[in-house]
Design a protein with these regions (language model features):
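Mid-domain alpha/beta scaffold segments of enzyme catalytic cores
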Residues: 1-211
């Protein structure tokens, strides 16, 4: 079986894991990195890339992100929103999906989604919200990625074709999440792996899985 880890900060040691590693496979400006100067993460760590001039750099990656809005940490929401919208524009320009970090700013994120009308997929990573919040994201076309600490009701309500699984910053086998989610959803682990592989290719614009 092949496990997909849709968002992680650690390179896995397991041979049967395809991991989308933040800063290695994705390019973006996290809201926590906006003070004093925004610095997108790329291969080799943080790079002093000016905002809005990352087209050539970003086009080599699977996705833009993680980026987004955080009402509890980082600079003012005005600054966060301005930089986030630049990355939305970059996502559309280089035809890459968006990986989103959002804390206590869901209503504004949903409003921006409706206003921007993006053609590229957006993923809300590390979702722990309640079913009502899940529905609000699904209604405007989001993919939702679950990690440890998920809301069980939301996990069971999320359509399989819009779901992703991740370890985020936790050092733990992604297989542990798959096993737990399969039990909660009444699926075989193999079936869940197949569904996540399909979602990987859909979200990342038919990017072939590594062999």
């Amino acid at each position: 079986m092949l496990y997909i880890d849709f968002h992680t900060h650690h390179v896995p040691v397991e041979q049967n894991v395809v991991a989308v590693v933040d800063g290695r496979d994705t390019w973006g400006i996290h809201p926590w990195s906006l003070s004093p100067f925004p610095s997108p993460k790329g291969k080799g760590g943080l790079k002093p890339f000016p905002v809005g001039e990352g087209k050539g750099e970003a086009s080599r990656f699977l996705a833009i992100g993680e980026c987004g809005l955080d009402a509890l940490r980082g600079p003012s929401m005005d600054i966060q929103e301005r930089v986030f919208l630049q990355q939305v524009a970059l996502s559309e320009e280089v035809r890459k999906p968006l990986v989103i970090h959002c804390v206590k700013a869901l209503d504004r994120l949903l409003q921006l989604r409706r206003e921007q009308k993006p053609t590229m997929p957006w993923m809300f990573h590390g979702f722990r919200g309640k079913p009502q919040q899940l529905r609000s994201l699904l209604d405007v076309g989001f993919y939702v990625s679950f990690s440890f600490g998920y809301n069980e009701e939301s996990l069971c309500l999320c359509p399989l074709e819009r779901m992703m699984l991740e370890t985020d910053d936790r050092v733990a086998p992604i297989a542990e999440i798959y096993y737990n989610v399969a039990i909660k959803r009444g699926l075989e682990v193999e079936e869940l792996c197949r569904a996540m592989a399909e979602n990987y290719q859909t979200f990342f614009q038919k990017t072939p899985l590594p062999t």
